[in-house]
């Protein structure tokens, strides 16, 4: 089989709701005509008509935070410590071996928005797809949020991975996970309601906080996971190397290649 790629990243773009209000990326586009003054300052005497087609260059000014778009969260995002008290890794310190491994997809599209996934749900889905987890496999979760992308409901859509479900994966050697939802955890609107009823702060970000016990990374805001089979592919998701940061943007892709699969354990 020839090597084939499926893009599982979302665009960074203006005017598409992928973050809560006030947190979205802002991109300014400067085209080949607009940029002439910037080019001319390097070359005194240059006239616009001297340039081929009268064009300079295209460039963009981008205002982002490290959690805009498809990105990889480092253990440092979840807490200052990991592995029971060790200093948490920042994104530039994450083991790159974690970021290129066989992928496994858990299909939780049927679960309602705000549902908190438990170990039994993970076990049932693994049984359904006939797969036993192996260390370092990248486990991605396909939620209803995938089909909500592009709408105002995106950040409130999809189920979330609970503390125990996350530990279930980590205890089996998984070190990198992912979701097509805004967050690995259930949407805040649902968790806020539970917190108001119980005053139990352990419910807040419970899946993320599993990283305090066993350090791991997760991808958020993946896209197009419905195009993937349950297994039989690799995922590549190397993060941008930002010094001391809690996350890095990534162009996550699924790779289908017989030679790669033959070499996997």
What residue spans do the PLM features occupy?
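Active-/binding-site microenvironments in catalytic and ligand-binding cores
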Residues: 1-265
């Amino acid at each position: 089989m020839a090597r084939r790629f499926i893009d599982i990243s979302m665009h960074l773009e203006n005017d598409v709701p992928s973050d809560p209000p006030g947190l979205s990326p802002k991109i300014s586009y400067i085209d080949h005509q607009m940029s002439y003054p910037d080019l001319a300052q390097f070359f005194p005497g240059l006239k616009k008509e001297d340039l081929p087609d009268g064009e300079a260059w295209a460039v963009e000014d981008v205002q982002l935070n490290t959690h805009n778009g498809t990105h990889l969260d480092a253990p440092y995002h979840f807490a200052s410590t990991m592995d029971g008290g060790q200093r948490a890794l920042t994104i530039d310190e994450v083991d790159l071996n974690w970021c290129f491994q066989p992928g496994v997809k858990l299909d939780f599209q049927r679960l309602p928005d705000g549902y908190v996934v438990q170990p039994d749900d993970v076990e049932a889905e693994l049984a359904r797809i006939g797969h036993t987890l192996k260390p370092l496999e990248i486990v991605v979760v396909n939620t209803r949020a995938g089909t909500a992308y592009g709408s105002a409901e995106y950040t409130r859509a999809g189920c979330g991975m609970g503390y125990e479900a996350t530990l279930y994966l980590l205890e089996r050697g998984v070190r990198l996970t992912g979701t097509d939802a805004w967050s690995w955890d259930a949407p805040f609107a649902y968790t806020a309601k539970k917190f108001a009823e119980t005053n139990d702060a352990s419910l807040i970000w419970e899946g993320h906080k599993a990283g305090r016990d066993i350090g791991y990374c997760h991808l958020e805001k993946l896209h197009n996971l419905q195009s993937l089979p349950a297994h039989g592919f690799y995922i590549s998701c190397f993060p941008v190397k930002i010094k001391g940061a809690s996350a890095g943007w990534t162009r996550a892709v699924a790779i289908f290649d017989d030679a790669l699969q033959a070499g996997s354990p």
